[in-house]
Structure formats: structure tokens, C-alpha cells
């Protein structure tokens, strides 16, 4: 059986994994005075040399004309993705759907950008995760496809994914729940948990996401619909925490369970990095 002390030990270790430094050789991506992300300098040069939408000095920035309206900002992001795709640098060029981009967790949407540009430019996007509980208190997890570029073959949350442009987090978690687990809104009971920001270095660039976590009590068996899950399995919460500690689970999925376990023990995590709805940031 786990304790709050052990759970917070897991929290500290996972938090360290989820907050990686910007690597050397990256430059800031800016829109006006806002820092939107980070990109490899040679990639920034490749884009800025092929379009007037972007300028490269000590950082990469939108031109004054491209920065004027949200529509023009989005067009510049799309053009940048097209250039990187043309050069064969994007890992998933087919993911052209738009996502919302923010300068920080507290800022409104600055612009929209293609999903396939988010990692390349290290853009701050929004994602959702759900820890699924069975009536006996065990946790349902999903194993990612071994061929996934990030976390292939690792255990993951029952459902997780990026929030699309103009989509609410609740709409996104229900969509992901149906796509990844085949469950509908009348088969689960959702509870909103905490929110944190993850920053990870990946081969393509950086993953920078505002992660909203939910719990769900489910009444039906999951069935994957999008082909992105190898298998589903149930574990006790302490087993899941040990999977996360052992590197056998996506770090963000482990963090979601840590937040959930603490909340179910009647304790919020007292750390500004983990934020709860209605909580004031000082």
C-alpha cells in the first residue's frame, strides 16, 4: 500500500523528468515581445531564408506584417510548417490540424498553428489526460504502440492527447476517450484534477504542453478505435506509481496518477507547478 510520503517522492522525481532545459543550439521563437517557443537554429535559418513572414537575429520572430492579426500569425505558422515539410524535417507531416498556441499558461490564445509544427517550434500547446478507475480502485492503463516516436511501448493514461484549436479541455478529453478507449460520455464519470506544464526535449525539438488531468470512473470495457494502443491492462495504484518510477510509463501519465492519488486521499499538492481550478497564483 502506498503512502502520501511515497507518492510525493514519485512526484518529485517525475517533476524533474517533466521539466527539461532548453538545449544549446536552440533559439527563441517570438511574436512581438512574447516568447512562443524554441527551435533549432539551423531550422530557424531554413525557414527565415525562405519566407518574409519570419526574421532571424538572436531569436526567430514573426515579421511586423505577419504579427498584426491572429489570422496572419496562423498563416505564418502554416507556411513555416510547409517549409520544414518540404525539407523533410517534420516527423508527422500529415498532422496538419490546428492547435491553439499560448505564450504562457496564464495567457490567452496568441495564435493557431499546425500540430505538426508544435514540436519543431517548441510551441506551448494544451493537452488532456485521464486516469481511469474501476469500481475496485484499480487503474486502467493503455500501452502505446511500439512504433510511436515518443514513448513507444510505454504504459500511458487510459486516454490522452492534444486539444484542438478552439476546443475546450472537456470536449477534448471526451473525444480522446472515444478515439482511444471507445468510451462515451454516458459510460464514464469525469472529475477534473490538477494542471501542470511539461517541457521535454525530443528529437524533433521540444514538447511544451499545459496538461489538464481528469479522473474517470468507468462502467464499460475499453476498445481502441484509432489504432494507437497495443493493449489495455489494470494495475493497483501503487503498481502504477512504481511503473512510473521505473521508466515503464509516460512521465505525464505517472504525474496524473500522483495528483489523483493525493486528491483522493484528501490532499492537494502544495506546489505552484501543480495548479487547481479556482486556485490563486501568488
What are these regions (language model features)?
Residues 223-253:
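NUDIX/MutT-family hydrolases
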Amino acid at each position: 500500500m502506498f503512502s502520501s510520503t511515497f507518492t510525493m517522492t514519485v512526484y518529485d522525481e517525475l517533476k524533474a523528468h517533466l521539466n527539461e532545459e532548453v538545449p544549446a543550439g536552440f533559439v527563441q521563437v517570438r511574436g512581438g515581445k512574447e516568447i512562443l517557443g524554441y527551435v533549432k537554429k539551423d531550422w530557424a535559418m531554413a525557414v527565415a531564408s525562405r519566407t518574409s513572414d519570419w526574421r532571424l537575429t538572436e531569436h526567430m520572430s514573426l515579421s511586423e506584417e505577419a504579427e498584426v492579426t491572429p489570422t496572419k500569425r496562423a498563416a505564418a505558422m502554416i507556411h513555416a510548417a510547409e517549409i520544414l515539410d518540404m525539407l523533410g524535417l517534420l516527423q508527422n507531416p500529415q498532422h496538419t490540424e490546428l492547435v491553439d498556441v499560448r505564450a504562457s499558461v496564464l495567457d490567452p490564445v496568441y495564435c493557431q498553428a499546425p500540430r505538426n509544427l508544435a514540436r519543431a517550434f517548441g510551441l506551448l500547446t494544451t493537452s488532456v489526460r485521464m486516469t481511469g478507475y474501476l469500481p475496485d480502485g484499480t487503474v486502467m492503463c493503455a500501452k502505446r504502440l511500439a512504433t510511436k516516436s515518443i514513448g513507444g511501448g510505454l504504459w500511458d493514461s487510459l486516454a490522452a492527447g492534444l486539444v484542438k484549436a478552439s476546443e475546450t479541455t472537456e470536449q477534448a478529453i471526451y473525444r480522446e476517450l472515444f478515439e482511444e478507449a471507445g468510451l462515451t460520455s454516458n459510460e464514464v464519470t469525469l472529475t477534473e484534477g490538477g494542471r501542470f506544464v511539461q517541457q521535454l526535449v525530443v528529437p524533433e525539438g521540444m514538447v511544451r504542453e499545459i496538461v489538464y488531468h481528469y479522473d474517470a470512473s468507468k462502467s464499460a470495457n475499453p476498445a481502441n478505435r484509432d489504432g494507437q494502443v497495443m493493449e489495455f491492462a489494470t494495475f493497483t495504484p501503487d503498481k502504477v506509481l512504481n511503473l512510473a518510477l521505473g521508466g515503464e510509463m509516460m512521465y505525464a501519465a505517472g504525474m496524473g496518477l500522483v495528483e489523483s492519488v493525493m486528491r483522493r486521499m484528501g490532499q492537494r499538492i502544495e506546489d505552484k507547478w501543480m495548479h487547481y481550478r479556482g486556485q490563486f497564483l501568488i
